[in-house]
Amino acid sequence: MAYPLQLGLQDATSPIMEELTSFHDHTLMIVFLISTLVLYIISLMLTTKLTHTSTMDAQEIETIWTILPAIILIMIALPSLRVLYMMDEINNPALTVKTMGHQWYWSYEYTDYEDLSFDSYMVNTTDLKPGDLRLLEVDNRVVLPMELPIRMLISSEDVLHSWAVPSLGLKTDAIPGRLNQATVSSSRPGLFYGQCSEICGSNHSFMPIVLEMVPLKYFEAWSASM
């Protein structure tokens, strides 16, 4: 969950988000080192009046600044590709949930169960209870079992939407006429909040997402009561 004046990413709750956080730190360190080197060179150029004429057209340094950026890009690309393939892998999901975006709410269908579907609207600010989060609470939460791979099938009924839950490392576009999929897996129970992350009209800001991750036995009891 995000909090005011937060500088870093939200706490990772899924293996994918842990990998994304590690990749972010890895890339940020490379960018920091490059920026430090560039600033150092600029400061030298501004503070010295000496010129080394033999290095103005040296083949050696041209070779170095051609090979070195290629190595740096490979160091960034390989972990990035690894995370991308991990995000795309869905092996033997325990549950499949179909998510449809609408202007301006979400609808969910548990395809492994008969007649288990509902719409999820934002709770009006006048109806909030003490402790509720403004513009993030919904009337029907998506209840899912924790520590199990869950496949989300995501599409849209009207315009482009995007189903995103930052703490789980999820952001998948909901495109009319196309079915995208994502993997949901939580390592701990709790409430995880997200929002539509694609501008989709005047009420784009009023499409929150709330996932309630619970142990399997509680999920089975919830699904039986629906």
From Swiss-Prot:
Q: Where does Cu cation A2 bind?
A: 196, 198, 200, 204
The residue stretches assigned to a coiled coil in this entry are none
**Residues annotated for Cu cation A1 binding in this entry:** 161, 196, 200, 207
The GO annotation for biological process reads: ATP synthesis coupled electron transport
Topological domain (Mitochondrial matrix) residues are: 46-59
- Topology versus the membrane: Multi-pass membrane protein
Q: Which GO terms describe its cellular component?
A: mitochondrial inner membrane; respiratory chain complex IV
What does the UniProt keyword field contain?
Copper, Electron transport, Magnesium, Membrane, Metal-binding, Mitochondrion, Mitochondrion inner membrane, Phosphoprotein, Respiratory chain, Translocase, Transmembrane, Transmembrane helix, Transport
- Transmembrane segment boundaries: 15-45, 60-87
Keyword Chaperone applies = no
List modified residues, type Phosphotyrosine: 218
The positions annotated for binding Mg(2+) are: 198
Cofactors demanded by this protein? Cu cation
EC numbers for this chain: 7.1.1.9
Enzyme superclass (EC): translocase
Entry similarity comment: Belongs to the cytochrome c oxidase subunit 2 family.
Specify the protein name.
Answer: Cytochrome c oxidase subunit 2
Source organism per UniProt:
Perognathus flavus (Silky pocket mouse)
Q: Gene that codes for this?
A: MT-CO2
